[in-house]
Amino acid sequence: MRHYEVLFILKPTLTEEEVSAKLEFVKEVLTKNGAEIESVVPMGTRKLAYKIKKYERGTYFVIYFKAPTNLIAELERVLRITEEVIRFLIVKYENKKEIAAWEKLSKGIKQNKKEIKASESTEG
């Protein structure tokens, strides 16, 4: 299994329910085709560097996952035909140095989420 990262941008006009439904849809495509999702990073709604399909803003997500190579073509196909996705990028981590960076990123994100939850529970 290879290490990958997919970043995708959703239309800013979607409601929170629609955004979470699309995120679950992408995660389902990954898991049904044999991927192991390591972490999901919701980056929120941000201003785009330039207009994409008449939108100036977009809701960003990054998913770190391990998958067989044949999954990537299916993931690309699904993201291309999904109207709510305005742009996506799939990155493959190949050599040992890149894989070490991938592991650090995916584990660091998990650790940060645990720290945030712990600080929220002690405050409230």
UniProtKB/Swiss-Prot annotation:
Keywords in alphabetical order, please.
Ribonucleoprotein, Ribosomal protein, RNA-binding, rRNA-binding
What is an annotated GO biological process for this record, any one?
A: translation
Mind telling me which Pfam families this protein's record contains?
Ribosomal_S6 (PF01250)
* UniProt key word Ribonucleoprotein: yes
Example GO molecular function:
small ribosomal subunit rRNA binding
Q: Does the keyword rRNA-binding apply?
A: yes
Q: Which domain of life is it from?
A: Bacteria
Q: Name one GO cellular component term.
A: cytosolic small ribosomal subunit
Query: What family does the entry list?
Result: Belongs to the bacterial ribosomal protein bS6 family.
NCBIfam families reported for this sequence: S6
Functionally, this protein is described as follows: Binds together with bS18 to 16S ribosomal RNA.
Query: Can you say what this protein is called?
Result: Small ribosomal subunit protein bS6
Q: Which gene encodes it?
A: rpsF
